[in-house]
């Protein structure tokens, strides 16, 4: 799964991404309606506003401020992840899977490894920062929809790679930079891109 990701401070590669989201016509509306400011650096958490890449009304790639978490009737906690293996079959995500796919740029994402304590009565958590090898930006795949006039998104997950499964059995669906323009294109079937998911990662212990 994925419940936190990180944006490096003063990263020149991220500057145009943040600038693009701030220039979006949606930016004033999101800032007025949602209490959280756009995450420009540091950890991004559920219900935060982050810069997201998606198609605009003219079907051209554009950056938007979006809120992390989809709400559903009768559920107090927002949904932040969706399984890439089954999202297309879920009524909540079927349309977004076909037409409203997005990319959430991050420096890396966080995952927690849970191991039993020495006495076996509790678990010991270890936090890891994970990112693709030889990549400065991690392109997380997501789905978005409009709720109350505001764009919200979930991050898609998949089975963890062999090198990461000891940390957690799930991980975000991440594509290489060359594939992201195809992911957000509604004319392309998303299943055609799943085999191109990044497979080589760096995982380092991180501070809580």
Listing of model-derived features with the role each one plays in the protein:
Residues 1-208:
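Short linear sequence motif anchored by a di-proline
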